[in-house]
Amino acid sequence: MNKLIQSKLELLPTSPGCYIHKDKNGTIIYVGKAKNLRNRVRSYFRGSHDTKTEALVSEIVDFEFIVTESNIEALLLEINLIKENKPKYNIMLKDDKSYPFIKITNETYPRLIITRQVKKDGGLYFGPYPDVGAANEIKRLLDRLFPFRKCTNPPEKVCFYYHLGQCKAHTICQVDSQYFKDLAQEVAAFLKGQDDQIIEDLRGKMAGAAQTMEFEKAAEYRDLIQSIGTLRTKQRVMAKDLQNRDVFGYYVDKGWMCVQVFFVRQGKLIERDVNLFPYYNDPDEDFLTYIGQFYQEKSHLKPNEILIPADIDEEAVRAMVDTKVLKPQRGEKKQLVNLAIKNARVSLQQKFDLLEKSIEKTQGAIENLGQLLNIPTPVRIESFDNSNIMGTSPVSAMVVFVNGKPSKKDYRKYKIKTVVGPDDYASMREVIKRRYSRVIRDGLTPPDLIVIDGGQGQVNVAKEVIQEQLGLDIPIAGLQKNDKHQTHELLFGDPLQVVELSRNSQEFFLLQRIQDEVHRFAITFHRQLRSKNSFSSQLDGIEGLGPKRKQNLMKHFKSLTKIKEASVDEIVEVGVPRAVAEAVQEKLNLKTQEQQQARLREVAEPQAEIE
């Protein structure tokens, strides 16, 4: 589990919603739902799992989540996201089964059934649902509300369901087939969220039963009303009109704005776009600017309708986008906007929480490091590393970390001037003396800790210069690497000793970042210098081609290869006389031929045996 996931897990809300797992390429590999996002997402990274889930977890590099108002919203949002993104592990973990539907069969006396196959058989299909459990839960409620046929084979006498009021016993009692057609339409309306009339009828029956003192029956009606309230399928993540619309919501805090856009297609929320950025003007104005820029991108097609918060100028949006723009005040559309705003608030808060945790961890790391080494908190740390290959172009580099963060304006590069050949100790001695002589001379701020990328020899050389030659009192530590070139151990003290440091501690991670950064900075400088020297050496000795013209050539063509490929006329255009341009081409092409011939000789000649 990487540090980003570790931090985000601590900040998950306990709300229901959907979570979205991504791999190293940012591809969605799994979408899931949860009644409690915190508990569910954390469970992936704790304990043991079956083989398939272990494979999923091994690929997770990041995750996102969308908060919903209820678990049923999460169910429906999950299926929409899965259908849209087709994550590979959703297919694997569900054993390649298709999703369940609730079906009203096309029979004279229809039945309510659950099926995974949608056929053109005249039946009415509702769904799909994310799993059989969700479909069964809704079907059980429908069975109690609508008296469809329950039996596959007609019984000879009325069945148990008839006495429960859940069947009309059509084979025994005369029931008009039109009754079931009307019943099917009622179910369709109910599943589309048109349940107000049903609830009103149930309330009337409940009141009637209570008046006649049939309290058990009244309790049954009460339970039915509560079940509808729990399982009603009129969801904020679903729209009844099957319209294509974009829903905008935003939230601002501490100079930052988060904009969330929900993409509703055919009435279903299939995707969302999240963007966080600092705002500098009036939030409403910056939000308007964002919408205008949003639809300038070719990937964002204008929908039939845009929903925006109530405090935004709809005429301004309409002028920019030229489509229907609404500021809903109530109902389903208002709930969609509220959901977008809620998710914007959650995303922005998560950013601040992650930032705060990062600051806390970094501050804690430098404080703990000071305690570990028994020195004042090392607010400013300067670190050094040397780089050379077989003594060629030896360089050194210094990086600076202030309050645990890189201070790149303070980085310094050093060309080694007094050392001949690959002498790491002498190079370190030169650079430390140059750096801290200048600190003394110019009155610069000295560091609280010097970290040397190296072992005992390099650290002792640095201590000799700092303490004995310059008379400074600056703590010096060393970072040794293992045979895999990874940060291995911390050296400190007089005499130097290995400091016990947990590899999972924030102090270790801080030192590791410092060592990786100084190594990167040094080796990048060394490569740049070698490339420049190689370029200069191949162009040396050409009459009329001085340092300025060499620099202009490199600036224009970027590399020797590009210069070799250029024509004489193209070189002349850079400001090089034609005779000199011809000499450049001749020398570079001759050099290339010599290199090719040398490689051919190497292949042809037998290699010396290694003893």
From Swiss-Prot:
Entry keyword set: Cytoplasm, DNA damage, DNA excision, DNA repair, Excision nuclease, SOS response
Domain GIY-YIG positions: 14-91
GO terms for MF: DNA binding; excinuclease ABC activity
Main subcellular location of this protein, as a coarse class: cytoplasm
Record-annotated UVR domain positions: 196-231
UniProt entry tagged with the keyword Membrane: no
NCBIfam families recorded: uvrC
UniProt keyword DNA damage, yes or no: yes
Function of the protein: The UvrABC repair system catalyzes the recognition and processing of DNA lesions. UvrC both incises the 5' and 3' sides of the lesion. The N-terminal half is responsible for the 3' incision and the C-terminal half is responsible for the 5' incision.
Gene3D superfamilies (UniProt xref): 5' to 3' exonuclease, C-terminal subdomain (1.10.150.20), GIY-YIG endonuclease (3.40.1440.10), UVR domain (4.10.860.10), UvrC, RNAse H endonuclease domain (3.30.420.340)
Organism: Streptococcus gordonii (strain Challis / ATCC 35105 / BCRC 15272 / CH1 / DL1 / V288)
Source organism phylogeny: Bacteria, Bacillati, Bacillota, Bacilli, Lactobacillales
Gene Ontology, cellular component aspect: cytoplasm; excinuclease repair complex
Parts of the chain that traverse the membrane: none
Biological processes annotated in GO: nucleotide-excision repair; SOS response
Family under the similarity heading: Belongs to the UvrC family.
Protein name, entry field: UvrABC system protein C
InterPro entries, per the entry: GIY-YIG_endonuc, GIY-YIG_endonuc_sf, GIY-YIG_UvrC_Cho, RuvA_2-like, UVR_dom, UVR_dom_sf, UvrABC_protein_C, UvrC
Record's subunit section: Interacts with UvrB in an incision complex.
PANTHER family in UniProt: UVRABC SYSTEM PROTEIN C, UVRC/OXIDOREDUCTASE
CDD domains referenced in this protein's UniProt entry, alphabetically: GIY-YIG_UvrC_Cho
Subcellular location: Cytoplasm
